[in-house]
């Protein structure tokens, strides 16, 4: 038979047990303690779970149920009302958000608040109404205030006045923007009248063909009037250029040549000639300064 050895060491007449036996005993004790703790926690949870059905604080209906604990706190159980589709916590405030609403939004940021000025027409109403009377009736039905109706009538009158003054606008109810004509004109078709744009014309002007006599009288008036025509001067022949009448308009005699830029020896002329050349140079200050510089260099 096999002999069972003692799991201990004998040293100097004393038995020293192995440490493995002690570790197994400690692990068994820890497991037992953990089991007792988990059992106690489960008992506490089952005891604190609300079994009583609480009425909804909003609609006072009893169709409520317990959902979960808020933030894993046993003192804040979260309930749900099936009637009004709202959540609330016992001891907290009620959330006014239905299921699937997602993130809460401000009332002012709702898309309907931006379009309060848009009026929606009633259903099953007339599809086409071209007369002004029908439009005024519809507007009076929509707006209960008489001041608004008066404003609409005034706008209609203004729109009619604008169309008579020449602005292209749609007839009927007043539009917020005037209708401008297209940039490119419409090409006329066969047997199709084309409306021409209003042109300011004098009352005496007549449409149609004009006689040639009127054109001749206009040409004679233009000839008799004081119209300056520039004269061309031929420079091929210096004698003809000297005899032309342009020199007289400038105040220079035809007999004497223009000596504005002459040398010092030729400048010594009579006083009359000096005054004439000085007048010409004074008329052109740039030429005067150039002539002075030229004389200084000489």
From Swiss-Prot:
This is Cyclic dof factor 1. Ubiquitinated. The keyword ATP-binding does not apply. Interacts with ADO2 (via kelch repeats), ADO3 (via kelch repeats) and GI (via N-terminus). Disulfide bonds: none annotated. Induction: Circadian-regulation at the protein level, but not at the mRNA level. Strongly decreased expression during the dark phase. Accumulates at high levels at the beginning of the day. It comes from Arabidopsis thaliana (Mouse-ear cress). The keyword Transcription applies. A zinc finger (Dof-type) spans 54-108.
């Amino acid at each position: 038979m096999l002999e069972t050895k003692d799991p201990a060491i004998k040293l100097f007449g004393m038995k020293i047990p192995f440490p493995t036996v002690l570790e197994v005993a400690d692990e068994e004790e820890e497991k037992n303690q953990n089991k007792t703790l988990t059992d106690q926690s489960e008992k506490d949870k089952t005891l604190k779970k609300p079994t009583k059905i609480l009425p909804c604080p909003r609609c006072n209906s009893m169709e409520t149920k317990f959902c979960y604990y808020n933030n894993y706190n046993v003192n804040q159980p979260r309930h749900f009302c099936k009637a009004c589709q709202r959540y609330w916590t016992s001891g907290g405030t009620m959330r006014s958000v239905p299921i699937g609403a997602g993130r809460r939004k401000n009332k002012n940021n709702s898309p309907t608040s931006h379009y309060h000025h848009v009026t929606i027409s009633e259903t099953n109403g007339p599809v086409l109404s071209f007369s002004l009377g029908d439009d005024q009736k519809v507007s009076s039905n929509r707006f209960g205030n008489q001041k608004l109706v008066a404003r609409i009538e005034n706008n209609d009158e203004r729109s009619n006045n604008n169309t008579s003054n020449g602005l292209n606008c749609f007839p009927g109810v007043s539009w917020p923007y005037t209708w401008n004509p297209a940039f490119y004109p419409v090409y006329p078709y066969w047997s199709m009248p084309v409306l021409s744009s209003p042109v300011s014309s004098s009352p005496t002007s007549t449409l149609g063909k004009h006689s040639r006599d009127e054109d001749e009288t206009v040409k004679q008036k233009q000839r008799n009037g004081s119209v300056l025509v520039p004269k061309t001067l031929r420079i091929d022949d210096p004698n003809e250029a000297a005899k032309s009448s342009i020199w007289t308009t400038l105040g220079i005699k035809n007999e004497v040549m223009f000596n504005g830029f002459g040398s010092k020896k030729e400048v010594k002329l009579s006083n009359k000639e000096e005054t004439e050349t000085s007048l010409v140079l004074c008329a052109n200050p740039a030429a005067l300064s150039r002539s002075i510089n030229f004389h200084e260099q000489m």
